[in-house]
């Protein structure tokens, strides 16, 4: 894990709150809400797939999105083990789809311990895939893998480098 889990109040019901406001007809009158120490949880039954924490953010009920700052996101594989752990400067979380975009010096750890860094990464919840088409470096047992992007199946832990992958061995 990149950061120690915090004891932040959980806003797992943020989507429900936003939906209630929108259904109440008051959504057009509600300005975006600035919140601090926020946590979003995407779960199905007892299984928590994704937890996104941010130091602060702006929740827009009109677009159903949260613009986040100082972000930590943690994904679980289907076996419940950590599959992907990411920190970044900024992020955008879609409250309706649970899609997530990490922006600004994205650093992460894959389930097998490999570390990576990239300028941005996107997570498509419906496909269970985290990906980037930006340059990425992955450190794995003394070697650095470089590519023009990657595709990572979060639920199964399978990684594929894309666009001109190369390996740099350390002497």
Regions found by a protein language model. Give the residues of each.
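Mature-chain termini and adjacent capping regions
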Residues: 1-171
């Amino acid at each position: 894990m990149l950061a120690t889990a915090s004891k932040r109040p959980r806003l797992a019901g943020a989507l429900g709150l936003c939906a209630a406001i929108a259904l109440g007809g008051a959504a057009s009158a509600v300005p975006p809400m600035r919140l601090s120490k926020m946590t979003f949880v995407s779960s199905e039954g007892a299984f928590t797939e994704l937890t996104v924490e941010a130091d602060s953010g702006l929740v827009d009920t009109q677009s159903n999105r949260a613009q986040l700052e100082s972000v930590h996101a943690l994904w679980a594989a289907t076996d419940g083990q950590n599959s992907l752990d990411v920190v970044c400067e900024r992020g955008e979380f879609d409250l309706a789809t649970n899609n997530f975009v990490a922006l600004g010096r994205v650093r992460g750890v894959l389930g097998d311990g490999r570390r990576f860094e990239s300028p941005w990464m996107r997570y498509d919840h419906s496909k269970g895939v985290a990906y980037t088409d930006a340059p990425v470096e992955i450190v794995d047992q003394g070697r650095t893998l470089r590519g023009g992007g990657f595709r990572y199946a979060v639920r199964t832990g399978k990684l594929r480098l894309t666009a001109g992958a190369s390996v740099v061995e350390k002497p």
